[in-house]
Amino acid sequence: MMISTAYQSLFLTALFSAISIAVGNVYQTLNVIGDRNVTIPTNGIPQRLSVYDPYRGVNCQGYQAVNISESQNGVTAYLALLGEPCYAYGTDYPLLFLNVTYEEADRVHISIKDANNTQFQFTSRKDLWDAPLYSPSYNNTNLLYNFSYNANPFEFWVTRKSDGEVLFDTRGQKLVFEDQYIELTTNMVENYNLYGLAETIHGLRLGNNLTRTFWANDEPSPVDQNMYGSHPYYLEQRYKADGINSTLNETTYTSSSHGVLMLTANGMDVLLRQDYLQYRMIGGVIDLFVYSGSTESPKETVKQFVQSIGKPAMHQYWTLGYHSCRWGYTNITEIMDVRQNYIDADIPVETFWSDIDYMEKYRDFTVDPVSYSKSDMQTFFSDLVSNHQHYVPIIDAAIYAANPYNHTDDSYYPYYAGVEKDIFLKNPNGSIYIGAVWPGFTAFPDFTNPDVVDYWKDCLINLTYAFGSNGTVPFSGIWTDMNEPSSFCVGSCGSAMIDLNPAEPLTGISKQYSIPEGFNVSNVTEYSSAYSASLSNYYATATSSVFQIVSPTATPLGLKPDYNIDWPPYAINNEQGNHDIANHIVSPNATTHDGTQRYDIFNMYGYGETKVSYAALTQISPNERPFILSRSTFLGSGVYGAHWLGDNHSLWSNMFFSISGMIVFNMMGIPMVGADVCGFLGDSDEELCSRWMAMGAFSPFYRNHNNIYQISQEPYTWSSVAEASRRAMYIRYSLLPYWYTIMAKASQDGTPALRALFVEFPNDPTLADVDRQFMVGDSLLVTPVLEPNVEYVQGVFPGDNSTVWYDWYNHTEIVRQYNENVTLYAPLEHINVAIRGGSVLPMQQPSLTTYESRQNPFNLLVALDRDGSATGELYLDDGVSIELNATLSVSFTFSDGVLSAVPTGSYEVSQPLANVTILGLTESPSSITLNGQNVSSFQYSNDTEELLITGLQNITSSGAFANSWNLTL
């Protein structure tokens, strides 16, 4: 959720004046960096240099390696500064310490820090971030890489042994290591293919003219700018010509991929340029990890990285259903009506979500006693439980700062308990840091505090009572928002002003007047209906807002000698005005319980909240997998939660960009990811929402979410959207066993569930930047329509002529030529889906909820390759528990006319197998048996080369996979 652009203009002037006053006072006491004077304009803001200014490091000479020691485990050395300090953007350290560790056969860690350990060292703080990467096996007897270096000047490079590829190469580049500026540069191959460096709005392939900034930022969908999360890892894919395919007269290629991680939570720019990539960090040390990757598949490279930061959580089965949400439901009755509308429209819906509307005056862990009364909520929850549906409320990061002089605030437990337990972030002087968010002046939990889990657990338990549930948990997960954490003022603006609370919530939120590109206004009837429905949405108003009483001064900054926190001399390319790193965010000078400044761990606040929420929820509901959807993420967030792509717009471009966003987050180890379907900001329209609802059915996390005052966009609002949704959801719910299997695979070893085409077909360089199509697992290729007013879409179907693709709907082979686009018919209510030959897809007959679908018989869809073979797998468990008493894995193979199923594990599935469909079968069988029993019910189509076998329930009445079986044609 964001503050509207229109309303920002009402208070930004006052806030910028606060910046000027505060920073001006600070810089009068700090005007020297090294031996250079800093120019201070009259407004008090120091003149700083960014990536767009002339580079200051041209005179830096780098370092020389001395006292070098090599061992089986790695290399250590001291690095002595060459020449005079260059003072590029700070004070140069004269002596550094190098520690190269061969941590795994496929991973090397290059650590460079100042010799006196002055700089903050992220890897020394396992209390902040603990990952498998911190527990290496030191299996260095069969290293897959070589680490090489030159001593004077010091430079290093990492190569892959098997093919000699140079993976990271600083030769010819100078290392710069200053107190608030660290620079490391690697040479890049020509026209390199880079993916990752999340989170940003960009196409899949990053290109070589881009600056990626890492600084958590509350801004809705800014293209090529920093956003909510920080994942400073990239995967590079390379291609090599190795011959000619005589049949196709085409060059053939081999490929390789590798990964690079710069482990830091500090602010950073990463410059992608034509022949180099450069890191520019404003603090910390260098902790570089190079992954040797794979010469076979980028999936292996992704797995190396994900397994090092922590394998993703396995979410409950129900999370794969469809989720309905909007900001602006006036009361619980409206949500009840929405639920009934879904039923009437025969559209599946799994979960209903509440935005901040349900809260009392937008205060966390409260419930509006009138609009969301306990009795009404209990009726609502009872209906959900009886229909196997779910509820998820939002929880913002900021806690309302109760006014000690206002007795109506006396009962606000989250604040007073936080004060008593000393939970909140502090100012440098030790007072509580007070910002401003929806409820007024707010404090912010310190999620690194060892006592915060108990505090957060108690707050969540209190929320269950506020819902009238007497301690039972009525919600199935939580939605953590605004957790960069966002703040609507600069600095600790409310430190001396809590007595003005309750400052009423915002009064200036307004409708976002934007409509999708290519909007067709001819269909005014349904548009008017949707708009009218939106008018019933209510937003609380009041006579004053927190922004009208924001203090014109900010708390003085806490500074180390010659160390500037809020205005470092190098300005990373932060999206906020003047690259201000303290704007619209909790200031980097805020400190944790042990005095650590946010400046050094800035990008991991959302990660901390997700981790703490996971721990708290597991204490409340032991052995039940928590579901936490977080806006801000960091390396390893997927271990504990899911992610949505934030406050997008109802634009075709945002629908397109969401494909790359989902693919990249799967590479980052967060497979449960999706966008706000139909868009959050601005009015959607019938065509865009129809296309997006269809595409969303093939995203791991599938939720329609809408902004306050925008027209309604629930799928039943328009007839065509309702029909498109039903069709796409029928496919999704049919494929729930397949979805659960690929999500389990992601949790088990890091294999991405949603994939770019180049990941699945790595030896085709033409796929390197294909981002208008995507793969779901190994077997499904989705080709959505991403522009208005069209009935056709083009897509590529990868693989050589031995590869087969089948149309999902008519089961016929798609006629294609190697490396050429195919034009596909795509009427408004249709999304093109193709099945890859060689696949066995486990399915179940769909119902309106995931629970009901799980009770239905199984089906198998077998799509044969050119050799008449296929393989597949199925994974099932109880869909709920963390510690599992039983699981079931089934391996499917089809070869020489026999379909085999081999189950392992003790989880019992009582549902029978109903049907088997086989595609690409060139002739009809004369007879069919299942474990020797005759099967008489089957049909074969010569036109489609499709065999449909039905009536298997009686033979498999004890369970589809209770035993191994062979289906023989």
UniProtKB/Swiss-Prot annotation:
SUPFAM superfamilies: (Trans)glycosidases, Galactose mutarotase-like, Glycosyl hydrolase domain. The active site is at 481 (nucleophile), 484, 647 (proton donor). The keyword Glycoprotein applies. Changing residue 714 to Q: No loss of activity. It is found in: Secreted. GO terms for cellular component: extracellular region. One of its GO terms (biological process) is maltose catabolic process. Changing residue 484 to D: No loss of activity. Its main location: secreted. It catalyses: Hydrolysis of terminal, non-reducing (1->4)-linked alpha-D-glucose residues with release of alpha-D-glucose. Keywords: Glycoprotein, Glycosidase, Hydrolase, Secreted, Signal. Belongs to the glycosyl hydrolase 31 family. This is Alpha-glucosidase.
